[in-house]
Amino acid sequence: MPKMKSHRGACKRFKATASGKIKRERMNGSHNLEKKNRKRTRRLHQSTMLDNATKEKQIKRMILA
């Protein structure tokens, strides 16, 4: 049986930390920022952790395959 390939789109969007959690970037933070206030744009540039356990298991399978 051949080796499992990792999902390249998921690898570009998610990163696994050393503790095993999944880090992701927030959406809506790349363009049309003049319509959003400064507090919101600052928050959108910060990365966050994935909090859905079932999605985390699926994404780990895609990234670490």
Curated annotation (Swiss-Prot):
Family: Belongs to the bacterial ribosomal protein bL35 family.
Gene3D superfamilies in alphabetical order: 4.10.410.60
Pfam family, one: Ribosomal_L35p
Gene Ontology cellular component terms for the protein in this record: cytosolic large ribosomal subunit
Signal peptide (UniProt feature, chain positions): none
GO BP term, example: translation
Keyword Ribonucleoprotein part of the UniProt annotation: yes
Bias (Basic residues) ranges: 36-45
Annotated segments matching region Disordered: 28-53
Protein name: Large ribosomal subunit protein bL35
MF terms in GO: structural constituent of ribosome
SUPFAM superfamilies: L35p-like (SSF143034)
Gene coding for it: rpmI
